[in-house]
């Protein structure tokens, strides 16, 4: 039994399922996970010494690669000053100023400890600010494990939410309306029926937790227009896309100003961090200024702030975003050529350094279309890639991430692994 197998056996006796987050269990690929010993740059080394090119990047935060030296230096310096204070510290102010500079829609920001905390707090704030109860979310958009947002769709275009997890009472989701992403008519119907009681519309502007797909027919501008017309807040969950697809996220690319933005991942530099921010008049409803309570013992942790600041500063130096685009384009070109060579018209989506390969020849634009992709083909592809030393996400519904630490050689080696893996699919 190898080291990873031994560790997984031990883990299952003390950790539910042997993992601390479900996707890590490899259930979607019918296997057991490997355990990581270390990570540096674009590579991870597992407990048995195997080195892999990594395209998970801790699920998004590692935009500079693993353990970048500027971030390590900042963390070491911060640790020497103390691990946490529970008292305001300069780094919190520096981080808030950095975020408000990079994301113009954010006039004020509150730090939290995860993306889940950010979306949970933003929803509470939206309800407190508007005095309304209902929320619209989109099927396939993931906003953390918040009770009211763990909702699956029922039949029809518009449903009152049914819980998507045991332990979530139906009453917790009854105020959440779910509609298909990219479906204007469903959104219009929701506002026709409930417009006066809709506090907010929340979405991932690029849904990236059901594969990766994009708005069609000016969908994001449509949402901004209809929410303004109904005095409803528009919340962009840019935990995935923020500071990655562009310094200011998807909202910068599309020229849209949401009322609130949820952030995380990249702004932590690899440590646990989340944030939510928006217009001052909305944010000032938060305690201690306003009636909406939100708090956190470790919010604004000085070590996490130091890591995040160092990462953001590095991103703004030189040509990091241009570099990420070049690497992403190189991968896309290579994978598309490989698909063409093997006569497979599978759908490949990319936004800068984010990417996803769907094993379907149909267009993917929402969760329903994403679910038409072959899980059987994906599973075979995943294990073939891993055998060749390339680690893609162990789920057909996850996004891959490129970092500035990847090289052209890494990309070319990955494309060659894709070619070989496709040839083995039969």
Swiss-Prot record:
The modification N6-(pyridoxal phosphate)lysine is found at residue 265. It comes from the Bacteria. The keyword Protein transport does not apply. Its cofactor is pyridoxal 5'-phosphate. It is found in: Cytoplasm. Its main location: cytoplasm. GO terms for biological process: protoporphyrinogen IX biosynthetic process. Disulfide bonds: none annotated. Its EC number is 5.4.3.8. SUPFAM superfamilies: PLP-dependent transferases (SSF53383). It is an enzyme of class 5 (isomerase). Keywords: Cytoplasm, Isomerase, Porphyrin biosynthesis, Pyridoxal phosphate. It catalyses: (S)-4-amino-5-oxopentanoate = 5-aminolevulinate. GO terms for cellular component: cytoplasm. Belongs to the class-III pyridoxal-phosphate-dependent aminotransferase family. HemL subfamily. Homodimer. This is Glutamate-1-semialdehyde 2,1-aminomutase. The lineage of its organism: Bacteria, Pseudomonadati, Verrucomicrobiota, Verrucomicrobiia, Verrucomicrobiales. The gene is hemL.
């Amino acid at each position: 039994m190898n080291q990873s197998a031994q560790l997984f056996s031990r883990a299952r006796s003390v950790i539910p399922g042997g993992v601390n987050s479900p996707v890590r269990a490899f259930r979607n690929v019918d296997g057991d996970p490997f355990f990581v010993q270390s990570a540096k740059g674009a590579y991870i080394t597992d407990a048995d010494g195997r080195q892999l090119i990594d395209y998970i990047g801790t699920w998004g935060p590692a935009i500079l690669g693993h353990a970048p030296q500027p971030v390590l230096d900042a963390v070491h310096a911060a640790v020497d000053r103390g691990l946490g204070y529970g008292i305001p510290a300069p780094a919190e102010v520096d981080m808030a100023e950095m975020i408000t500079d990079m994301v113009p829609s954010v006039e004020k920001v509150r730090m939290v400890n995860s993306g889940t905390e950010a979306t949970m707090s933003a929803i509470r704030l939206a309800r407190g600010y508007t005095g309304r109860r209902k929320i619209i979310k989109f099927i396939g958009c993931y906003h953390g494990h918040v009770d009211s947002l763990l909702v699956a769709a029922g039949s029809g275009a518009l449903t009152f939410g049914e819980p998507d997890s045991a332990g979530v009472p139906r009453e917790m989701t009854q105020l959440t309306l779910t509609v298909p992403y990219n479906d204007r008519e469903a959104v219009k119907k929701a506002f026709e029926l409930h417009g006066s009681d809709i506090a907010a519309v929340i979405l991932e502007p690029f849904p990236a937790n059901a594969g990766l797909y994009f708005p069609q027919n000016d969908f994001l501008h449509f949402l901004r227009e209809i929410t303004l017309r109904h005095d409803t807040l528009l919340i962009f969950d840019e935990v995935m896309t923020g500071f990655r697809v562009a310094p200011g996220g998807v909202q910068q690319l599309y020229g849209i100003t949401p009322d609130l933005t949820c952030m995380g991942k990249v702004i932590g530099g690899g440590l646990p961090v989340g944030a939510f921010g928006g217009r001052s008049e909305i944010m000032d409803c938060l305690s201690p200024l306003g009636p909406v309570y939100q708090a956190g013992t470790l919010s604004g942790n000085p070590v996490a702030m130091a890591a995040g600041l160092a990462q953001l500063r590095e991103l703004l130096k030189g040509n990091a975003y241009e570099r990420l685009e070049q690497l992403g384009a190189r991968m896309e070109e290579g994978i598309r050529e490989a698909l063409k060579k093997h006569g497979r018209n599978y759908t490949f989506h990319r936004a800068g350094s984010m990417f996803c390969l769907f094993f379907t020849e149909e267009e993917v634009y929402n969760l329903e279309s994403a679910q038409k992709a072959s899980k059987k083909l994906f599973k075979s592809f995943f294990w073939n890639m891993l055998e060749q030393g390339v680690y893609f996400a162990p789920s057909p519904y996850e996004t891959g991430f490129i970092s500035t630490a990847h090289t052209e050689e890494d990309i070319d080696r990955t494309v060659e692994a894709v070619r070989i893996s496709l040839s083995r699919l039969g």
